[in-house]
Amino acid sequence: MSFQLAPYLAKSVPGIGILGGIVGGAAALAKNARLLKDKQITGTEAAIDTGKEAAGAGLATAFSAVAATAVGGGLVVSLGAALIAGVAAKYAWDLGVDFIEKELRHGKSAEATASDEDILREELA
C-alpha cells in the first residue's frame, strides 16, 4: 500500500498545521509566480512572501483545528469556530509580521527616544 500523506498528517494538530502550510504556501507560490513573471516582484521577494504565507496558513490551520475540536457541537458550530479561529490567527500573524518588518526596516537603535510601549501604542492606534 502506498503512503497516504493527508491521512497521516491529519492524525495530529502539528500535522494539520503542516498540511495547511503546504496548501497556503502553494497558493502564495502561485500568486508570486505570476507577479514574478510580470516583473512586479523579485525572486527574493517572492520567496520571502511565500514562506511567510505558508507559515501563517499553517499556524491558522492548526489553531482552527484546535478551536473546532474544543468547541465541539454540530457541523455548523464546528465550521463557525474553525473559520473564526483561522481568521483570527492569520490576522494576528500578519500584524506580527508587519510589525517585525517595520522594526527591521527602521533599524531600532539603542539611542531611540521612543520606548517599546510607545512604538506598540503607535502601531495599534
Curated annotation (Swiss-Prot):
Upregulation:
Part of the probable 4 gene mamGFDC operon.
Domains (record comment): The lumenal magnetite interacting component (MIC, residues 36-56) probably binds magnetite.
Q: Which UniProt keywords apply?
A: Biomineralization, Iron, Magnetosome, Membrane, Metal-binding, Transmembrane, Transmembrane helix
Q: What else is known?
A: The most abundant protein in purified magnetosomes. This bacteria makes up to 60 cubo-octahedral magnetosomes of about 45 nm in diameter which contain membrane-bound crystals of magnetite (Fe(3)O(4)).
Q: Which residues lie on this side of the membrane: Cytoplasmic?
A: 1-8, 86-125
Regions that span the bilayer: 9-29, 65-85
Q: What happens when the gene is disrupted?
A: Single gene deletion leads to slightly smaller magnetite crystals, but no other measurable phenotype. Deletion of any 2 genes encoded in this operon (mamC, mamD, mamF and mamG) decreases crystal size regardless of the protein combination. Deletion of the operon leads to smaller magnetite crystals in irregularly spaced chains, but no other phenotype. Deletion of approximately 80 kb of DNA, including this operon, leads to cells that are non-magnetic, lack internal membrane systems, grow poorly, have reduced mobility and take-up and accumulate iron poorly.
The answer to whether keyword Nucleotide-binding applies is no
Please state where this protein is localized: Magnetosome membrane
Q: What membrane topology is given?
A: Multi-pass membrane protein
Lineage of this protein's species?
A: Bacteria, Pseudomonadati, Pseudomonadota, Alphaproteobacteria, Rhodospirillales
Q: How does it assemble?
A: Probably interacts with MamA.
Keyword Protein biosynthesis attributed: no
Tell me the function of this protein.
Plays a role in regulating magnetite crystal size. The lumenal domain may bind the magnetite crystals, affecting crystal size and shape.
- In the UniProt record, which is one GO cellular component term? magnetosome membrane
Would you tell me the protein name for this molecule? Magnetosome protein MamC
Q: Which domain of life is it from?
A: Bacteria
The record's family statement is: Belongs to the magnetosome MamC family.
Residue ranges of the region described as Magnetite interacting component (MIC) binds magnetite = 36-56
Give GO MF terms, alphabetically: metal ion binding
Instruction: Tell me which parts of the chain lie in the Lumenal compartment.
Output: 30-64
Leader sequence residues: none
Question: Where does this protein come from, organism-wise?
Answer: Magnetospirillum gryphiswaldense (strain DSM 6361 / JCM 21280 / NBRC 15271 / MSR-1)
